[in-house]
From Swiss-Prot:
SUPFAM superfamilies: LuxS/MPP-like metallohydrolase (SSF63411). InterPro entries: Metalloenz_LuxS/M16 (IPR011249), MPP/UQCRC_Complex (IPR050361), Pept_M16_N (IPR011765), Pept_M16_Zn_BS (IPR001431), Peptidase_M16_C (IPR007863). This is Uncharacterized zinc protease RP219. Its EC number is 3.4.24.-.
Amino acid sequence: MKENFNVSKLKNGLTILTYNMPYVHSVAINLIAKVGARYENEEEEGISHFLEHMAFKGTKTRTAQQIAEEFDSIGGYFNAYTGHENTVYYARVLSENCHKALNILADIIQNSIFADEEIAKEYQIIMQEIAHHHDNPDDLIYETFYNTVYKGQPLGKSILGTTKTLVTFTKEHFLNFIGKHYNAENLYLSIAGNIEHNKIVMIAEELFASLKQGVKSSFIPAKYIGGKGFIHKELEQTSLVLGFECTSYINLGQLYQTYLLSIIFGGGMSSRLFQSIREKLGLAYVVGSYNSAYFDSGVFTIYASTAHNKLELLYREIKNEIIKITETVSTEEIIRAKMQLRSNLQMAQEQNTYKSEEIGKNYSVFGKYILPEEIIEIITNIRADDIINTANKIFSGTTTLAIIGPNDLNGF
C-alpha cells in the first residue's frame, strides 16, 4: 500500500526510503551504492567487488572481530553483494535492534581503514574465488557469453576483475574510489519492516550526516555486439548459451512482455523448451530461458546441456522452437504465464527483505515507488500479439552463442 511507503532526503542528498510492515517483528535494511563493475575503468576492474569484501575488515572504531561479534550479539544477519550496476550492503535484524545495525553499517561505509595486511589477505581470497569460478563450467560459459555480448565493454566483464588489476590495489585506491562514488547523492538507504519513518530519518541524520553530497556516478552506455565464443574443456556434457538483445528495465511495458515471453518459452516445466527438448525429445536434463535487464540494455538468454553427439540436434530444435513462438502463442499459455508473474509478485510483497530491495531499486532507477498494482495492470493488459511482436523483435536480432565442451566446435 502506498500509505505504508515514505521517502525523505537529508540535507546532504542521502535518500531515505521506508516501507512500514507493522505485522512483522524484523526490519530488512539495504544500503544501495549506485556503482558496480560497469562504472570501473580498465585500471579499476574488480575494485567494486574487492571494496565490498573489505567492508567487514575493520573501521576506525571497530576491528573485524568486533564487527562480527556486535552483529552476532543482536542476532543479526549482515552481508553485501556486487553487481554490474550497484553494490548493496544489507542486514536483517529485529526491529528493536535497527539503530544498532545502522550504526555498524554507517561505520563500515564511512570509516573502513583498509589495513595493508587485510588487503593482502582478501586478495588471496578473491584469487581463490576466481580460480573456483574458472573451474566451474557454468560460471565459465556465462563469463564467455557476456564477454561476447558486450565485447570490450565494462558490462561484459567479470565483476571479480583480473590478477593484473587486483594486485595493484592499495588503501589509496579504495579511498579514492569511495570518495568518487560513495557520496550521499549516490546512496539510497531503504528499510522495510516494523519501523517508523521519522525515527529512521532521525537516526540517519545522526549517522550519515558526515557524508559528502557529491554527484551521481555515470557509466559508458552499453552496446550489444554478439558473436560466438567457444571454450574447449573435457566435460561429461556440452553446454550452450544462446542470446539475443532485448529491452532494458526502463520500459516496463516491454520488460513485462519479455518476462511473459521467457516464461512461455523456457520458464518452467510447462514451457515450450522443457516440453519439447526434455520431455518429448529427451535431449537435455537442463533447458530454459530468462532475460537479464540493465539500465540501457538487456539480453534474452537460452541455456541447455546435452550429450556431445546431440549438440547439433539440440541447437536445431531450439531454433525450431524460436520460429514457432514468433508465429503463435495460445491463450492458455498467456493465462498461465501471467498467473506465474502475478503470484511471484504478490507473494513477495509479504517479505520485508523483498520490499526493502523493491523500494530501493525503484527509487534508485525511476526516482519513484512503483506500486505492485501498477505492475499487475501492465501484466494484465499484455495481449498475445504483444508477446508475438516481442518475440519477432528479439529473435530477428544478432545472435550470441557460447559453447563449452570437448568437441571440435568450428562447425557452429
